[in-house]
């Protein structure tokens, strides 16, 4: 039988939903020659902000 280990939930990852435009959206980002462009057409469900629907694809 393998020994039991204690897991701490607060180490390395904190669960929860963050507002996409507050954490990942960077409108002033300037593209580089090494960037790859991918395009998706996303239609958010009623009541879902476009940024949040786009974050689901990202």
Swiss-Prot record:
- Cellular component GO terms held in the UniProt record: chloroplast
Q: Which terms under GO biological process does the entry name?
A: photorespiration; reductive pentose-phosphate cycle
Note the Gene3D superfamilies from the entry.
RuBisCO large subunit, N-terminal domain
InterPro entries per the UniProt record, alphabetical: RuBisCO, RuBisCO_lsu_fd_N, RuBisCO_lsu_N_sf
Reaction(s) the record says it catalyses: 2 (2R)-3-phosphoglycerate + 2 H(+) = D-ribulose 1,5-bisphosphate + CO2 + H2O; D-ribulose 1,5-bisphosphate + O2 = 2-phosphoglycolate + (2R)-3-phosphoglycerate + 2 H(+)
Propeptide residues? Answer: 1-2
* Residue positions where N-acetylproline is found in the record: 3
Key word Plastid present: yes
Q: What is its EC number?
A: 4.1.1.39
One of its Pfam families is RuBisCO_large_N
Q: Which domain of life is it from?
A: Eukaryota
**Gene Ontology molecular functions:** monooxygenase activity; ribulose-bisphosphate carboxylase activity
Query: At which residues is N6,N6,N6-trimethyllysine found?
Result: 14
The UniProt function text for this chain reads: RuBisCO catalyzes two reactions: the carboxylation of D-ribulose 1,5-bisphosphate, the primary event in carbon dioxide fixation, as well as the oxidative fragmentation of the pentose substrate in the photorespiration process. Both reactions occur simultaneously and in competition at the same active site.
* Additional free-text comment from the UniProt record: The basic functional RuBisCO is composed of a large chain homodimer in a 'head-to-tail' conformation. In form I RuBisCO this homodimer is arranged in a barrel-like tetramer with the small subunits forming a tetrameric 'cap' on each end of the 'barrel'.
Assembly notes: Heterohexadecamer of 8 large chains and 8 small chains.
What this protein is called in its record is: Ribulose bisphosphate carboxylase large chain
Top-down, what is the taxonomic lineage of the species of origin?
A: Eukaryota, Viridiplantae, Streptophyta, Embryophyta, Tracheophyta
């Amino acid at each position: 039988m393998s020994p039991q280990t204690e897991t701490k939930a607060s180490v390395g990852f904190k669960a929860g939903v963050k507002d996409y435009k507050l954490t990942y959206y960077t409108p002033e980002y300037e593209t580089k020659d090494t960037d790859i462009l991918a395009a998706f057409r996303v239609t958010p469900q009623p009541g879902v902000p476009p940024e949040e629907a786009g974050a689901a694809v990202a």
